[in-house]
């Protein structure tokens, strides 16, 4: 008999710009990955090691994690020691429009302040209607006023020289792009392009593109698309290919994600 998933996902039509992940006593580990959304999380029990550009950092129960879109990271528990956490994903375009900014950055990606933890705890709860969605939006403004700063560009790192390749990748991650073609877009050799790309984003071009495709499939699944449709739309060879990649990056199958379990 299959064990129930420790992961739950909460989405509501009143807040289409937000999604909540609630993971209880999860032993699962993640590969380095990134999200298209802002990620705001709190550890409820246990501890995790937060791998990111300025890490790794241990985060204990009550600790808060803040992650910008496109920032590579992974949060993994100690071996044999499950942890519980909640993570709120907020659509970047919606948030930028609401706050009137091009992008946001978090000067500190981990916080242990009790007031901040209490605020994030209140934000990381399921939305059940319009009133709750309005409270969530106002709470986000309050949190970001304290913890975020406006940024000029939403591109990760010193990526100006890589902008042509990044634009191509984001415009069509499902297309048959090669390292050579992306390097030519930036006027670089393939070797130099890979080195510069990894220094700016924390990932190889191939890993970055795979993340974009997985995130694209995730968005489609959240709107009710069939697994086969999401796999085809994002350029995966078949459903099994998407399932393997999705589970490695999100610690659950795309089917479980679509069902919210």
What are these regions (language model features)?
Residues 170, 175-212, 231-260:
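Basic/polar phosphate-binding segments, predominantly the helix-turn-helix DNA-binding elements
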Residues 218:
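Short, amphipathic alpha-helical "recognition" segments used to contact nucleic acids or chromatin
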Residues 3-104:
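N-terminal regulatory/effector-sensing and dimerization cores
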Residues 175, 223-225:
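Flexible coil/turn residues that form the inter-helical turn or adjacent wing/linker of helix-turn-helix
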Residues 4-8, 29-31, 104-107, 130, ...:
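Jelly-roll (double-stranded beta-helix
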Residues 102-117, 121-186, 199-211:
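Short, Lys/Arg-enriched, Trp-marked, Pro/Gly-tolerant hinge/linker segments that flank
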């Amino acid at each position: 008999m299959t064990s129930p998933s420790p992961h739950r996902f909460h989405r509501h039509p009143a807040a289409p710009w937000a999604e909540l992940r609630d993971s209880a006593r999860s032993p699962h580990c993640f590969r380095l990955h990134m999200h298209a959304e802002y990620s705001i999380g709190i550890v409820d029990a246990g501890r995790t090691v937060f791998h990111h550009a300025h890490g790794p950092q241990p985060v204990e129960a009550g600790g808060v994690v803040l992650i910008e879109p496109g920032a590579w990271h992974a949060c993994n528990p100690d071996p044999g020691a499950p942890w519980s956490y909640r993570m709120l994903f907020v659509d970047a375009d919606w948030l930028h429009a609401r706050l009137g900014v091009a992008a946001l950055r978090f000067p500190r990606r981990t916080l242990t302040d009790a007031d901040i933890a209490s605020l994030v705890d209140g934000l990381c709860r399921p939305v059940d209607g319009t009133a709750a969605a309005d409270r969530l939006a106002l709470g986000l403004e309050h949190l970001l006023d304290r913890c975020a700063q406006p940024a000029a560009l939403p591109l990760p790192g010193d990526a100006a020289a890589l902008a042509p390749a990044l634009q191509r990748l984001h415009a069509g991650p499902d297309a048959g792009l090669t390292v050579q073609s992306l390097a030519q877009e930036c006027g670089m050799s393939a070797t130099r392009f890979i080195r510069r790309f990894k220094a700016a984003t924390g990932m190889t071009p191939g890993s970055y593109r795979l993340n974009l495709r997985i995130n694209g499939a995730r968005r489609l699944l959240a709107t009710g698309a069939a697994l086969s449709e999401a796999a085809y739309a994002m350029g995966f060879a078949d459903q099994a290919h998407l399932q393997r990649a999705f589970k490695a990056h999100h610690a659950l199958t795309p089917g479980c994600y679509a069902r919210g379990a």
